[in-house]
Amino acid sequence: MGETEKRIATHGVRCFSKIKMFLLALTCAYVSKSLSGIYMNSMLTQIERQFDIPTSIVGLINGSFEIGNLLLIILVSYFGTKLHRPIMIGIGCVIMGLGCFLMSLPHFLMGRYEYETTISPTSNLSSNSFLCMENRTQTLKPTQDPAECVKEMKSLMWIYVLVGNIIRGIGETPIMPLGISYIEDFAKSENSPLYIGILESGKMIGPIVGLLLGSFCARIYVDTGSVNTDDLTITPTDTRWVGAWWIGFLVCAGVNILTSIPFFFFPKTLPKEGLQDNVARTENDKEEKHREKAKEENRGITKDFLPFMKSLSCNPIYMLLILTSVLQINAFINMFTFLPKYLEQQYGKSTSEVVLLIGVCNLPPICIGYLLIGFIMKKFRITVKKAAYMAFCLSLFEYLLSYFHFMISCDNFQVAGLTTSYEGVQHPLYVENKVLADCNTRCSCLTNTWDPVCGDNGLSYMSACLAGCEKSVGMGTHMVFQNCSCIQSSGNSSAVLGLCKKGPECANKLQYFLIMSVIGSFIYSITAIPGYMVLLRCIKSEEKSLGIGLHAFCTRIFAGIPAPIYFGALIDRTCLHWGTLKCGEPGACRIYNINNFRRIYLVLPAALRGSSYLPAFFILILMRKFQLPGEMYSSETELADMKQTVKKSECTDVHGIPKVENDGELKTKL
């Protein structure tokens, strides 16, 4: 009876330890890490406004994840394979959860968010200091009150978000290299593309949930529950609006910690997929083999590091692949990181709307593409070389197709004194002294305050005072300004809070942009798996983990870290009007020159992607001349495994172990 129970327990452990169970757990880890990453990316504009920081610092915060990843990627990739890989992945998930929790802390440590406005929440008909008034003395200089300046120092709490993102990057370090190498070591070579496709497709669940979560949180005011939202004079489409970004980070922290649990129950090694264990081997033999293997690993844990690095450095396909990846990832990070900001400024949408559109339109085709290419490569046994040729052609086609984005654009917001004159004539450049005009010089208005109103003539103004408005009716977001001397229209010369919305033709262009994005996302996902398989097969099996880690190291140090920083700095140069803090320091940008923004957003990534096809072309040439090391090793491994399986089937009969499928298949593989 005891032997039967032991056999049942052993069978249960072996079933739990199969590669597909690990694939499921790793997919959950991919979901949790991509959930955290995509949510972070969707909340960048909210963080920028919360802490009143420029886009370059936002890029630094976003790139700090790569800094954390960079600190350990080489060590984890090499030494991690000689340790317990599943447990290291589990520890990484826990660290990611702690990093997400730290990122939410500033909300609880700092005071309420105070947005820049000329209107008091308690403004009424008798309190009209924000309107146009003649012979009034207004202080055009910012306050120098030390108490106010100390209060603004709380904006430095963005450093908590920076450090939390670094910790999140440290936690994610072991997941990809150790997870992929674990699957590659114990899965059939023909199943690897399918499994990686499942991983990448499953990973898309995280971004979908993350973007939905981001859209939900962006609609909720940051201080919900502690302020009366009826008193707010801004809406989610306003560039001063800050959503409840901190809620999502708490959710991400919990999800990451939960997904860590299964990895602590996986063994260090698994039997090769498709082969059965020799269960007749005694437990003493197993323990002796494990002891000898552990001693051998401890002796060689460092001696192979430098030879492996030299071998990888002398691998031309591998080095060209790193160069291609660096250029492609630079372009991808630049476009994806600031895509929400671009759509907000280009098409006049709120963060909540933009994030939802990205999730609905871009992620499903990516998921379908990952699964489709993995299935096709397995079903039709497409070699890595053929897949690489196909990926190159499709990627080049998608790149040429992306140039249509240059024709799908909208004009600047029509803001008097910034992008147009008060007569509605567009300015080629922003000229600060044009903020004041004959219609508002008598009003003694603050010229550096951003509290826009939309006139019934279709023009926006930086404030009700600069629009020459002398009267207000209503409260909160329903406030209406009347008798506005700068608004020349056939109506009553009135204005409402907020920028004027862009026309219906701009909404149509947004639809075309999204259609192009769907096509581009689908083609991108189809080309991603073959490219990754080339990476796995162009290096020797014993160098695989280090090769993956070195590839990740180079893409992070030359793309992941600098790309959002320099791209954010370039975007800052297109800003037309900066918010003003109480001590006179510039805050977050309120409005951009969308024409310059569009050129930077589209031209720079196009140049980077275009240059990446030159090393990619050389990779195809080299692949025609040489056999990839991974393919050679894979064939030899399968040959040895098939011979061993046949021998065991002939000599042993252990609990009905199935035999080789047929002799013809064996001869074919031999």
Curated annotation (Swiss-Prot):
The keyword Transmembrane helix applies. The chain crosses the membrane at residues 21-40, 60-80, 87-111, 156-184, 204-224, 243-267, 312-333, 354-377, 382-405, 514-536, 546-571, 606-623. GO terms for biological process: monoatomic ion transport. It comes from Mus musculus. The keyword Glycoprotein applies. Expressed in brain, choroid plexus and lung, but not in liver or kidney. It is found in: Cell membrane; Basal cell membrane. This is Solute carrier organic anion transporter family member 1A5. Na(+)-independent transporter that mediates the cellular uptake of a broad range of organic anions such as the endogenous bile salts cholate and deoxycholate, either in their unconjugated or conjugated forms (taurocholate and glycocholate), estrone 3-sulfate and prostaglandin E2, at the plasma membrane. Responsible for intestinal absorption of bile acids. Capable of thyroid hormone transport (both T3 or 3,3',5'-triiodo-L-thyronine, and T4 or L-tyroxine). Residues 41-59, 112-155, 225-242, 334-353, 406-513, 572-605 are extracellular. It holds the Pfam family Kazal_2.
